[in-house]
Amino acid sequence: MALFLDIHTPKYKDKREVIWDMAEAMNKELLALRDAGCRCIQIEEPTFHFMANTYGKDHEQVKFMIDAFNREVQGLDDVELWIHTCWGNPNMQRVMEDTSYANSIDIYLERCRGDVWTLEMKDRNQKDLELFAPFKNDLKKKIAIGAVSHRVLQADRPEDVAGEIRKALKFIPPERLVVSSDCGFGRQGCNREIAFYKASAIAQGCNIVRRELGLVTTYVPAADAVLQIDVVPGRDVQSTARIAS
């Protein structure tokens, strides 16, 4: 949706017309993905959180963009639809002063279609988690919190991720919680190796909390000592293989 706002053409007298036509065009592409077998689609930046903080959540422009977004994803009820929201990431820089979801939480939870809402949280010190308290027992969407930052190059530890998850569980039930990064690592600055360590920490951190909740853990190859290639001299790899988690 953010890209649609930047379209400039003399073919349309009203920016809303081009946005709506682009939403319909995108809908055809998304339905084609669905028909090809795709069962999980993420939509990047509907911009509701930016616009709600600028104009107010009930502004006519915001209402129109919600309608356009819902038109874009129409007919995808059999696909898990992710709605990605962060606060910008040019060269891994913070660019927004007001990064509160307070004006947009109702939009994302109640007014727009989708199954999973992703939020930038780690880099904002989990600000706004308390906003989910009134919805805790009736969340219609899964909530994907960022548990590692896409702007910090220091690799996170599994214990760090587990700590972020515990904070989120105070306001979001485990069956509705998804753990992710704040945003993608594919922009400028973060190399593949650091991104790998951060992603691995997410998986291992989830397992720490799963054990605490009595839930089944998942196998994480990155934590399997048997697969380790940079073995420290004198370390007994076989004795540590059991910690693969």
What are these regions (language model features)?
Residues 1-245:
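Domain-level signal for soluble alpha/beta catalytic cores
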